[in-house]
Amino acid sequence: MRKTPFIEEALHEKLINVSSLARVILPEVSLLLKKEVKIGAVMMAINRLSPANELRIRKNIKKLALDLGDVIVRSDLCDFTFKNTTSLLKEIAKILSKSADSNDYFLTVSQGIFETNIVTSKNLQPYVQEIFKKEILINSVVNLASITIKLPKENLEQSGIYYFILKQLAWANIPVQEVISTTNEMTIVVKDKDVNETFSILMDMKLN
């Protein structure tokens, strides 16, 4: 349990059935103790468990949430995912150069091992389609919006800050299209129809 503190959180909020959890961890408990253990004993141990880790993590994250900086919203975005190729980097350089022509352009590039994701403002969409026309398009989505959160510098030392933020959106049944991060910024990309609710949830985190 101490290895998975977020299970403690779910237990504290009564989101996990104690009996079901006991059945799941019973084999591991028996193995550790090297003897047969009854499920009732495991349930009693879980119920007596002090949520120290969960409360400490929650307190620290809550403090960070109150210290969140500016929240910036952008709409009319497009999302493209291309297969990584030897020519792709040259094309990325072209779209980066184009995006520098105007402050109205928005562009993020995230390169993975096998694919590269590009999120752009709608006014850059024709240039992306032209520049990358010979590349292998894996997926594209339009009618998106992004919310960028300025994170306090302490976020690097606190586990669970991303979990805490994304959990709120998951509970609201908001599908996150992309998550883009730098050292002290987190950008969440959602569908246009979900941006108002997403913004409201994030502001509630700052204010409450």
Functional labels for PLM-detected ranges:
Residues E8, H12, I16-S19, V37-N208:
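A conserved regulatory-domain signal marking ACT and ACT-like small-molecule sensing domains
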Residues L26-V42:
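Short, positively charged loop/turn segments that connect secondary-structure elements
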Residues M1-L31:
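Long amphipathic alpha-helical segments
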